């Protein structure tokens, strides 16, 4: 990674699994909105990213949102400060608490096998490339960027598509349509880099099983 000063990126992520918890193959998707500035005081740049799986769970897709978004920004060849906003307690609690306990125990836990262990390891490895603040918001509460990420995830789950990386965002058109319908919407301001504080440094992921 480049040693240039760490730029700030805001990531909003959500996941969808159609029929989550039901028997059979339940298709799912993960949706991500990224916001950043090329230079200070310039307008925000937005990019979308989405992935899908034909048979999955909400938790798997939440982890995929971390892996895919962190991997995408790592391709820029530099380290970023990242505010990762999600309505998934599974991700926020996992990244700020559980992974540290699991790592101390050699990536095991007393209660039995760790669900989605290999995805957790991949998520930790991908996020460790950056300084990340893990932020939870209540889902479906009018938070514009996360509502948008949810819509991307639902669409990806339904049509089983992938953006194959970062693409131009449709957020501006989406929020204009939402405001025109007078739907409750709170546009999150871009994070203030002057007060950014990363969450606890992630542990080193245990080598993946052969």
Task: State the predicted function of each range.
Residues 44-53, 117-125, 168-176:
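Low-complexity, flexible helical/coil segments
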Residues 1-60, 71-72, 187-210:
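RNase H-like nuclease fold core
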Residues 15-23, 27, 67-148, 174:
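RNase H catalytic domain
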Residues 158-210:
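Acidic two-metal-ion nuclease catalytic site recognized across multiple nuclease folds
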Residues 35-39, 59, 107-111, 158-163:
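Glycine-rich loops and low-complexity Gly/Arg-rich segments
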Residues 62, 66:
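Short, conserved alpha-helix that lines the donor NDP-sugar binding/gating region
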